[in-house]
């Protein structure tokens, strides 16, 4: 009989990378640069989001051999992406020992209706969310970590800011209703708007935050971007294309780690932001055709 990881164990792993940076890497050399820079973990994938966006086509789980090579090369946790709803890709990633599976909208969805039942796995999962409803639905499915979706591969933090603000505003509403004793409104919010069990709403009201670690992702390209998301209440950051699509990946990686850890110290952020070289070329969100937006995948 398969042994399933408990929510406590899965969420415990997520807390281990709290206040850290998870960096997208496509090979062993990049993984070693990330580890040397102080990354809390790496996300192993064959193409960073910026390349997926440009090249198009169907984006799938990466070659397990490439993931294993990266696992053998570094001592920090290694994560990998599965398509939304593709539970067999997730089974494969779990079988090769990835530390966390990202059920990711960056890849082409396999199921347009259902997400993976994450409670059926021992490996913990991270999922993206644009608002409190999406976040809590993924947690109800068994996600041990949430991240903003942002708009991956753009180098533009505006969507990540929008999504984090929406989550924060949703939490504030829940807490406000609870403090005013508006139980009927909370029940209606849970049932009709958020579509999650009341137990999750009660947990949010008590904690005044999500019950799992919440990272920023999507469009983070500079140390200041990382610090901005941390000041908004994120527990850490994912950086995809922003490091290895920049002019000086080694220096930028270290700078983003420093800024994430010292997010409330403007002098430190200013110092590490000096002489970073060219940032990745960004994309304005309003220039992206509606059908090319990744964040709308998987609600």
UniProtKB/Swiss-Prot annotation:
InterPro entries registered for this protein in UniProt:
Aldolase_TIM, PdxS/SNZ, PdxS/SNZ_N, RibuloseP-bd_barrel
Q: Which CDD domains match?
A: pdxS
State the source organism's domain of life: Archaea
Listed under GO biological process in this entry are:
amino acid metabolic process; pyridoxal phosphate biosynthetic process; pyridoxine biosynthetic process
Q: Which PROSITE patterns match?
A: PDXS_SNZ_1, PDXS_SNZ_2
Q: What pathway is this protein a component of?
A: Cofactor biosynthesis; pyridoxal 5'-phosphate biosynthesis
Q: Which residues form the active site?
A: 81 (schiff-base intermediate with d-ribose 5-phosphate)
What Gene Ontology molecular function terms does this protein carry? pyridoxal 5'-phosphate synthase (glutamine hydrolysing) activity
- What broad class of enzyme is this? lyase
Instruction: Please list the residues that bind D-ribose 5-phosphate.
Output: 24, 153, 219, 240-241
Q: Which Pfam families match?
A: SOR_SNZ (PF01680)
Where, if anywhere, are coiled coils annotated?
none
Q: Which reaction does it catalyse?
A: aldehydo-D-ribose 5-phosphate + D-glyceraldehyde 3-phosphate + L-glutamine = pyridoxal 5'-phosphate + L-glutamate + phosphate + 3 H2O + H(+)
- Disulfide pairs here are none
Protein keywords: Lyase, Pyridoxal phosphate, Schiff base
Annotated family: Belongs to the PdxS/SNZ family.
Q: Which PANTHER family match?
A: PYRIDOXAL 5'-PHOSPHATE SYNTHASE SUBUNIT SNZ1-RELATED (PTHR31829:SF0)
Which HAMAP family does the record match to this protein? Answer: PdxS (MF_01824)
Question: What binding partners and quaternary form does the record give?
Answer: In the presence of PdxT, forms a dodecamer of heterodimers.
Stated name of the protein: Pyridoxal 5'-phosphate synthase subunit PdxS
Q: Give the gene symbol.
A: pdxS
């Amino acid at each position: 009989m398969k042994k399933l990881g408990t929510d406590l164990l899965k969420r415990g792993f997520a807390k281990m990378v709290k206040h850290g940076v998870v960096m997208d890497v496509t090979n062993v050399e990049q993984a070693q640069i990330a580890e040397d820079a102080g990354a809390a973990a790496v996300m192993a994938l064959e193409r960073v989001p910026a390349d997926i966006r440009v090249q198009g086509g169907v984006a799938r789980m990466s070659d397990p051999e490439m993931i294993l090579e990266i696992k053998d090369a570094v001592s920090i946790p290694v994560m990998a992406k599965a398509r939304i709803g593709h539970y067999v890709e997730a089974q494969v990633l779990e079988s090769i020992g990835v530390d966390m599976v990202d059920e990711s909208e960056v890849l082409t969805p396999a199921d347009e209706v259902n997400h993976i039942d994450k409670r059926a796995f021992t490996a913990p999962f991270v999922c993206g969310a644009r608002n409190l409803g999406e976040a809590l639905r993924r947690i109800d499915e068994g996600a041990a970590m949430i991240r903003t979706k942002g708009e991956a591969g753009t180098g533009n933090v505006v969507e990540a800011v929008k999504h984090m603000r929406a989550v924060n505003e949703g939490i504030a509403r829940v807490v406000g209703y609870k403090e005013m004793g508006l139980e009927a409104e909370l029940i209606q919010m849970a049932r009709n708007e958020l579509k999650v069990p009341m137990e999750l709403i009660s947990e949010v009201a008590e904690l005044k935050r999500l019950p799992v670690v919440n990272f920023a992702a999507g469009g983070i390209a500079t140390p200041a971007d990382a610090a901005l998301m941390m000041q908004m209440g994120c527990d850490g950051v994912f950086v995809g294309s922003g490091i290895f699509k920049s002019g000086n990946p080694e220096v930028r990686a270290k700078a983003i780690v420093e800024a994430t850890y010292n997010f409330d110290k403007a002098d430190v952020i200013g110092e590490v932001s000096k002489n970073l070289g060219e940032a990745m070329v960004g994309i304005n969100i309003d220039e992206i055709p509606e059908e090319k937006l990744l964040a709308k995948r998987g609600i």
